[in-house]
Amino acid sequence: MSTADLMENLREELTCFICLDYFSSPVTTECGHSFCLVCLLRSWEEHNTPLSCPECWRTLEGPHFQSNERLGRLASIARQLRSQVLQSEDEQGSYGRMPTTAKALSDDEQGGSAFVAQSHGANRVHLSSEAEEHHREKLQEILNLLRVRRKEAQAVLTHEKERVKLCQEETKTCKQVVVSEYMKMHQFLKEEEQLQLQLLEQEEKENMRKLRNNEIKLTQQIRSLSKMIAQIESSSQSSAFESLEEVRGALERSEPLLLQCPEATTTELSLCRITGMKEMLRKFSTEITLDPATANAYLVLSEDLKSVKYGGSRQQLPDNPERFDQSATVLGTQIFTSGRHYWEVEVGNKTEWEVGICKDSVSRKGNLPKPPGDLFSLIGLKIGDDYSLWVSSPLKGQHVREPVCKVGVFLDYESGHIAFYNGTDESLIYSFPQASFQEALRPIFSPCLPNEGTNTDPLTICSLNSHV
């Protein structure tokens, strides 16, 4: 077997079935066949069928293959060896490039001529018949490969043109599905909106009924009190009481009136639960940490700067301008001058707490009320079984049926929007009127005073990344 045949056999063994070239980063599939990594992945990508071996078409359990580094090294060596052999043949064929034509003529006379000099006397020569045939075969082989590759490219082009139409049809179908589903969602949300509005209207009617009934009751009580006052004043101004029984009667009639303490009616509104609000808000989740430089000296912060509680004893901390000296307050490290931001705070079973947003320039010294526009906060207050929420500033209260355990804070800086949400049931607690922010804003937190040991739990900033 000639060297050329050996080289050809070696090339066939080290050639990828797909690209018909020497292996490049070869991998071996479950069935034992090897391919270039890029070729195999491209083949699987182009054929939208169950994964199979491109050579034997055996169905594979999955995209499993092993790297075959040794085969890659052999292919690299064979490529270099082939190049050297071809170069050697060219050098042998160029033996006729000699200073004189005598050697070429002598070899030609012996019938073993490898070269024939050109008639113009130049040094350019012809290859021997054997070398010429070898190169002709190689050219034909390359030509055949090029034709195969062109045929493959034409097939892929035809397939891609079909995929263009298919892609357009699939996109059109998906758009129709999206429009249809969002129409259903819009209808669902519209119905939810109507239900919430009806619920609020019913609660408004009930609250108005309570207020009117209490108004009538108080009016009657005032009339009775006025009548009794007039009777007693009239009796006391006379020179002498007509009888002891008259005095006793007046006292007996006044006793029930004295026992009736005027009371204001408690009105309640359900927190507005908005479907899908939690998912929408959490798209704007912002990592919030506490700023130790602003914390009141009585406050204790956790190591991760996510939790704060009232410590009970004053810590030895510098009285820097940023620190709150009277209010049990700490600011968040983050400073906002743009964008939308949302975070949640676990308030747990605390009986008093305050969370919200304030201007970065808010006063840190003293304990005076903050001017309107400097502070946007939500205050939770529990006294006995009575639980209420207050917003500041200006201060405005609202009774709620159940305590809020987790508060969501939302800021849209550009639109001037700040709102508080119940982080447990997605309901809206309060939305401030639209404002125009002209300076930086920061989160603000206050665990408030311990209240004789009933309010010692911490405020904890929740991590939302794992829930999104």
Swiss-Prot record:
Pathway: Protein modification; protein ubiquitination. GO terms for cellular component: cytoplasm. Its EC number is 2.3.2.27. Residues 133-158, 184-237 form a coiled coil. GO terms for biological process: innate immune response; protein ubiquitination. Residues 267-468 form the B30.2/SPRY domain. Transmembrane segments: none annotated. PANTHER family: E3 UBIQUITIN-PROTEIN LIGASE TRIM (PTHR24103). Probable E3 ubiquitin-protein ligase which plays an important role in blastocyst development. Interacts with USP5. This is Probable E3 ubiquitin-protein ligase TRIML1. It comes from Homo sapiens. The gene is TRIML1.
